[in-house]
UniProtKB/Swiss-Prot annotation:
It is found in: Cell inner membrane. The keyword Transmembrane helix applies. Its main location: membrane. Residues 400-519 form the RCK N-terminal domain. The chain crosses the membrane at residues 5-25, 29-49, 55-75, 87-107, 115-135, 152-172, 180-202, 207-227, 230-250, 268-288, 291-311, 324-344, 356-376. Keywords: Antiport, Cell inner membrane, Cell membrane, Ion transport, Membrane, Potassium, Potassium transport, Transmembrane, Transmembrane helix, Transport. Pore-forming subunit of a potassium efflux system that confers protection against electrophiles. Catalyzes K(+)/H(+) antiport. This is Glutathione-regulated potassium-efflux system protein KefB. GO terms for cellular component: plasma membrane. Interacts with the regulatory subunit KefG. InterPro entries: Cation/H_exchanger_TM, K/H_exchanger, K_H_efflux_KefB, Na+/solute_symporter_sf, NAD(P)-bd_dom_sf, RCK_N. Pfam families: Na_H_Exchanger, TrkA_N. It is a multi-pass membrane protein.
Length: 601
């Protein structure tokens, strides 16, 4: 029966999401708000299909965990070091200022000073899941406001630890005494995780990838995320912080893109479940009986946080067109409030209906954010269509690749080296793990992964790249990549390697006109030198080479519709006679006209 109830719950979540999210998108209110409304509909205060909300809410936090892992993969340690001032400067200022103002307002009501401190800290936190999702939807991750927003969220995650430790101290319980031995063991365990992750993760994934079984690689990625999350929870730290660190440790590895596409589907589903769970947790009974106090609390919360964030963004020097986005996307309460307020309630810091009032306020504030961001978008369209003042800080430079090279064998290496020598930004994808390990040992930026997977191409930057070079060995894979890019990334210029005429025909039929037959050019070059060794003048040998190249391409195009047809033989004979006639004409016309070609190259 328990298994059946679990299946029924899963079916309800899927049905709610499938119905509510498209409707929300049709109404223009966004997918996040659609998930929240779906949760209200099926929760205990809606149709009552789901009653155990807290258990589901705890499980759905894995969505935030997976999201933080992917963000860690995208953030190299060097980049994190560059953000240290915004993390510990703007992030710390936001938490302290917001907590002071909101806590002071709570103290002016019926809250004790201890409860006001915890309430202010909890309300100062923003929703990591909602903010990061909205930042991605609004493409804020490409500019400075997104980086600053991420810095604030990261500091909030770090602030979880001292905030939870503060609860028993304010409650005056015996548990407020610090167990230094236990604390030291936790610090050592955390340091062990960092060292072990730094030196063991790559060899482990190299061993797994060598098996060539994609499902095992996905299982290993899930094991890493869940294992690091549970390890951090056992230490009393944030699960999301643990997976974020694991992601950073692998950010510069060759497995980054493959890990991202392995985790991304789970992240999306669990994030949706998280938002549904938040909607289910909304206590409509408390809302109905205290509607005026709660609405006033939501307005107070959103207004104070927006004002504090806008002020900090201005001091930081953020572009005027980004301040509203930055302050709006972080204006809500967050999922950490549920944890902190529950801990405070267990020590009797809150009295009466204070805790449910705060939780409903936080939940409603999360529901206002998608609507608030729509309003921000409308304001920006009217006010900031023109270029900002030259004194303002420029957009962060986009480091997306200009070219994606698929395959790093002998052929792909030459192409990639030429591009890098000319300072072009490239990303190289290779599925042979031994080749990846070897090339990275020489300093090449090569990533392990199967480029026939749509999400890998997307993670590698195909949506913003200008060109894609297909230099892989397998013709089936090459054609699969061509069709995938033509369907999902039509802006890409596709340049491909063809092993022979058959592959060249297939590429032409698929609409790829820029290709190179891997042995053709080198064979032509050797043929030219052979002609010169027989006494032909360099100029004449070069012209013969170019004539042959043009005629061969004409033959290739002419024979393409009849590939495998009986007419092919006669067409080849006709082309050979045409080539002989051209050479004879060249000999008669260009005899002794070889100025500047006396030296062979």
């Amino acid at each position: 029966m328990e298994g059946q109830s679990l299946l029924m719950a899963g079916l309800l979540y899927l049905c709610a999401a499938v119905i509510a999210v498209p409707l929300a998108a049709r109404l223009g209110i966004g997918a996040v708000l659609g998930y929240l409304l779906a949760g209200i509909a099926i929760g205990p205060w809606g149709l009552g299909f789901i009653s155990d909300v807290q258990e589901i809410l705890h499980f759905s936090e894995l969505g935030v965990v997976f999201l933080m892992f992917i963000i860690g993969l995208e953030l190299k340690p060097s980049k994190l070091w560059e953000l240290r001032r915004s993390i510990f400067g703007v992030g710390a200022a936001q938490v302290l200022l917001s907590a002071a103002v909101l806590g002071g307002l709570l103290w002016l009501t019926d809250f004790s000073w201890q409860a006001a401190i915890i309430g202010g800290i909890g309300l100062a936190m923003s929703s990591t899941a909602m903010a990061l999702q909205l930042m991605r939807d609004k493409a804020m991750n490409r500019n400075e406001s997104g980086q600053l927003g991420f810095s604030v969220l990261l500091f909030q995650d770090l602030a979880v630890i001292p905030a939870l430790a503060l609860v028993p101290l304010l409650a005056g319980s015996d548990s407020g005494h610090t167990d230094w031995m236990k604390l030291g063991m936790k610090v050592l365990a955390f340091a062990g995780m960092l060292v072990g992750g730094r030196y063991l993760l790559r060899p482990i994934f190299r061993f797994i990838a060598a098996s060539g079984v994609r499902e095992v690689f996905t299982a290993a990625a899930l094991l890493l995320v869940l294992g690091s999350a549970l390890f951090m929870e056992a230490l009393g730290l944030s699960m999301a912080l643990g997976t974020f660190i694991a992601g950073i440790l692998l950010a510069e590895s060759e497995y980054r893109h493959e890990l991202e596409i392995a985790i991304d589907p789970f992240k999306g589903l669990l994030l949706g479940l998280f938002f549904i769970s938040v909607g289910m947790a909304l206590n409509l009974g408390v809302l109905y009986t205290h509607i005026l106090e709660i609405l006033a609390g939501v307005v107070m919360l959103v207004t104070v946080k927006t004002a504090v964030l806008y002020l900090l963004a201005r001091i930081y020097g953020l572009r005027s067109s980004e301040r509203l986005q930055f302050s709006g996307v972080l204006s809500q309460g967050g999922e950490f409030a549920f944890v902190l307020f529950s801990a405070a309630s267990s020590t009797s810091l809150f009295s009466g209906d204070q805790m449910p009032l705060l939780l409903v306020t936080v939940t409603l504030s999360m529901m206002t954010t998608p609507l608030l961001m729509q309003g921000v978008d409308k304001i920006l369209k009217h006010r900031f269509n023109e270029v900002d003042d030259s004194q303002e800080k420029p957009f962060v430079e986009d480091d997306k690749p200009q070219v994606i090279v698929v395959g790093f064998g002998r052929f792909g290496q030459v192409v990639a080296r030429l591009l890098m020598a000319n300072e072009k930004r490239i990303t190289v994808l290779e599925r042979d793990i031994s080749a990846v390990s070897l090339m990275r040992s020489y300093g090449y930026k090569v990533y392990y992964g199967d480029a026939t997977q749509l999400e890998l191409l997307r993670a590698a930057g195909a949506e913003t790249a200008q060109s894609l070079v297909i230099a892989c060995n397998g013709p089936e894979d090459a054609m699969a990549i061509v069709h995938l890019c033509q369907q999902h990334f039509p802006h890409l210029q596709i340049l491909a390697r063809a092993r022979g005429r058959v592959e060249a025909h297939e590429l032409l039929q698929a609409g790829v006109t820029q290709f190179s037959r891997e042995t053709f050019s080198s064979a032509l070059e050797l043929g030219r030198k052979t002609l010169m060794s027989l006494g032909m003048h360099p100029h004449q040998a070069f012209r013969a080479q170019q004539h042959f190249r043009r005629l061969d391409m004409r033959m290739l195009r002419a024979l393409m519709p009849n590939h495998g047809d009986s007419q092919q033989i006669s067409r080849v004979k006709e082309a050979r006679r045409e080539l002989e006639d051209i050479f004879q004409a060249e000999l008669r016309h260009e005899k002794r006209q070889f100025d500047g070609w006396d030296e062979a190259d």
